[in-house]
């Protein structure tokens, strides 16, 4: 159905490796279950793709280090999606950020 909506001008992939090997793709957005984030990020960097990844970056510190090593080795950009970090509401939970900041700065 999605293909009909865009008149057959987008590609559908059943395997992420096919997507990252596509020369028409410049950047990948990783929005999969967290256990895939590290694997996909490393492979995307190796394939020369810049990466936009949803939280959490990886499941472990070791996986995160491997991602950063791959990003540096292959000269790619990595961006972790951190929406609502700088808005009036903290992560959309209805908690104002400024009172929290004052509380932290007060030393409590």
Feature locations, PLM:
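N-terminal glycine-/serine-/threonine-rich beta1-alpha1-beta2 phosphate-ribose binding loop
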Residues: 1-53, 62-77
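A contiguous active-site-proximal alpha/beta segment in oxidoreductase catalytic domains
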Residues: 50-54, 58-108
């Amino acid at each position: 159905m999605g293909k009909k909506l865009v008149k057959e001008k987008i590609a559908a992939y059943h395997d992420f490796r096919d997507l990252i090997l596509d020369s028409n793709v410049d950047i990948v957005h990783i929005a999969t279950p967290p256990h895939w984030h590290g694997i996909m990020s490393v492979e995307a960097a190796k394939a020369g793709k810049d990466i936009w990844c949803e939280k959490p970056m990886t499941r472990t510190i070791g996986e995160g280090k491997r991602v950063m090593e791959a990003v540096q080795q292959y000269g790619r950009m990595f961006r972790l999606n951190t929406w609502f970090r700088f808005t009036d509401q903290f992560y959309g939970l209805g908690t104002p950020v400024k009172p929290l900041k004052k509380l932290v700065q007060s030393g409590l």
